[in-house]
Swiss-Prot record:
Domain of life of the native organism: Bacteria
Organism taxonomic ancestry: Bacteria, Pseudomonadati, Chlamydiota, Chlamydiia, Chlamydiales
Protein name: V-type ATP synthase subunit D
One Pfam family per UniProt: ATP-synt_D
GO terms for MF: ATP binding; proton-transporting ATP synthase activity, rotational mechanism; proton-transporting ATPase activity, rotational mechanism
Residue runs in coiled coils: none
Length: 203
């Protein structure tokens, strides 16, 4: 429940100051919202491209699906490369810290050419492509998620300012102003009446 409005000059000044602050802060919020909307659109495109690349890599790897069901070949792929370098950082976009994937390096390990079929290179290359594309796709999705989350938060604040805080404060100022004006008129009337009575007593 909201507190009762104090119909005083101090309250009037406080509400006017509050309205000024809201009016000053709203453009900043709206600018941030616009920036976030642009960044979200960009992140959506990047995420879509990364997901498409990952799906294509997965489809190419599915060509070897039967081979992945054979433990000998599955073990060969698992033992033939590893994630050697994984560099991540944090990037600030419109005030939001999002993960930045700087570099991922998959290192190929030595394996016996005599003990593996000639197509094992294609199988390993397909698996490496899939792993890399999945890492980048997951990073792109996380960036998008964080930006969308902040956009929702800022949008809620903009709506709160525009639909509730500013109109409510303006209405409060108007109500106090009307009350103070009416009271001033009443006070003037009472003063005139008092002066008139004093004058009558003198006569």
């Amino acid at each position: 429940m909201s507190s009762q409005i104090k119909l005083t000059k101090n309250s009037y000044r406080a509400e006017k100051q509050k309205l000024n602050l809201l009016g000053m802060y709203l453009p900043t919020l709206k600018l941030k919202k616009a920036l976030l909307q642009a960044e979200v659109q960009s992140a959506m495109r990047s995420a879509a491209e990364s997901m498409a690349a990952n799906e294509q890599a997965r489809d190419r790897m599915h060509a070897f699906a039967e081979l992945f069901s054979i433990p000998l070949y599955t073990d060969a792929v698992e033992q033939c490369f590893s994630i050697d370098i994984f560099e991540k950082d944090v990037e600030n976009i419109a005030g939001v810290e999002v993960p930045l994937l700087k570099r991922v390096v998959l290192t190929s390990l030595e394996y016996s050419l005599l003990d593996t079929p000639i197509w094992i290179d294609s199988l390993i290359a397909s698996a490496k492509e899939y792993v890399l594309s999945k890492i980048y796709a997951e990073n792109a999705q996380e960036r998008l998620r964080l930006l969308e989350e902040e956009l929702r938060r800022v949008s809620i604040r903009v709506n709160l300012f525009e639909k509730k805080l500013i109109p409510t404060t303006s209405q409060t100022i108007k109500k106090i102003a009307i009350f103070l004006s009416d009271r001033s008129i009443t006070d003037v009337g009472q003063m005139k009446m008092a002066k008139k009575k004093i004058q009558q007593h003198k006569e």
